[in-house]
A protein has these predicted regions:
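Alpha-helical membrane segments of multi-pass proteins
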Residues: 1-316
């Protein structure tokens, strides 16, 4: 497939990590990354000027999440991803699974709700619009697991095993739209599972773990399908430039291995985050119970002991 419409030199030298990490910004994603960090920093500054704090860990997570997008979209990895299936798969896995998790751990919605000013009575400002969106029927639908899990799976099988992938890769606009789609799908999939930001759905911890593991095996199956294929699956990568010195089928096998192996990394990250949240939730519950006991003299325990004493008296 001709990629000259992307404005890239098709005679790329053989891929190395050093060459792949050279700066080569996509204007759309470069501007988006700069804006994201700028707006986040502005919101944090508003809180601090007001005398409120914001956890440094959340700042680190969000910034690293944005930088992970820049890493795969504003370097030569983006150029090599147009002609090498394996490099494209790295982009896909990072921008759809790793970046969303890091961004969500930064709690951008919570930050926005705290930083945006409350509009006057009877008025609608940005904060009120955001709250309305969060509680809208549309948001309830697109964050429900009945929608997010099939969408997460379809972004693999419905894209790579149909002509849609070749169509999107045929233009710069299509390629950008595909990458934005990957990021959006990752965000709506992991948002209710992570449970860091407020949203329409907040299932229990066990249910969130089940939702996480419901989608992950399909990544492994997809990777295995690529590795076991005896012919190139997508037309875009059937004839890589001779200057790369690679075989299309071998490169596809590497892409499958990346998809298979990478699915484990986000699962572990999210599982650690969920266990930590669960532990902190139990701690808060225990502290509330202790405070209640201190206030009422632990009447609940006294009532239970009295009940046991009455049972013992009846038995005598």
């Amino acid at each position: 497939m001709d990629h000259s419409g992307h404005g890239m030199d098709m005679d790329l030298p053989p891929f190395t990590l050093g060459r792949g990490l050279q700066f080569s910004a996509d204007p759309f994603f470069l501007i988006g990354c700069v804006l994201a960090i700028g707006l986040y920093a502005y919101a944090v500054l508003r809180l601090r000027r007001r005398g409120d704090g914001w956890p440094p860990g959340r700042i680190v997570f969000f910034v690293v999440g944005v930088l992970s997008i820049a890493l795969v979209m504003c370097t030569k990895l983006n150029d090599y991803g147009m002609v090498m299936f394996s490099v494209h798969m790295v982009q896909h896995m990072v921008i759809s699974m790793l970046s969303p998790i890091l961004l969500l751990l930064g709690a951008p919605v919570t930050l926005a709700l705290r930083a945006l000013p409350v509009a006057g009575r009877g008025r609608t400002g940005p904060r009120e619009l955001l709250l309305k969106l969060l509680h809208s029927r549309y948001m309830k639908i697109i964050t429900h697991p009945v929608f997010t899990i099939p969408l997460f799976i379809a972004s693999l099988y419905g894209l790579y095993f149909t002509p849609l992938f070749d169509f999107l890769m045929g233009s710069k606009t299509g390629h950008i739209a595909m990458m934005v789609h990957f990021l959006a799908v990752g965000l709506v999939f992991f948002w209710p599972i992570m449970g860091v930001d407020p949203g329409p759905h907040r299932p229990g911890y066990v249910m969130r773990m089940l939702e996480l593991f419901a989608g992950m095996p399909f990544h492994a199956f997809f990777g295995i399908a690529l590795m076991m294929a005896t012919t190139p699956i997508v037309g875009t990568y059937q004839h890589p430039p001779a200057s790369l010195g690679i075989d299309a089928l071998s490169d596809q096998g590497w892409a499958g291995g990346i998809a298979w192996a990478f699915s484990e990394i986000p699962s572990v990250l999210v599982l650690i985050a969920l266990v930590f949240q669960w532990y902190r939730s139990e701690q808060r519950t225990a502290k509330r119970s202790d405070r209640a006991a201190d206030r009422d003299g632990d009447q609940e325990l006294q009532a239970y002991n009295a009940y046991l004493a009455s049972l013992q008296a009846r038995g005598q």
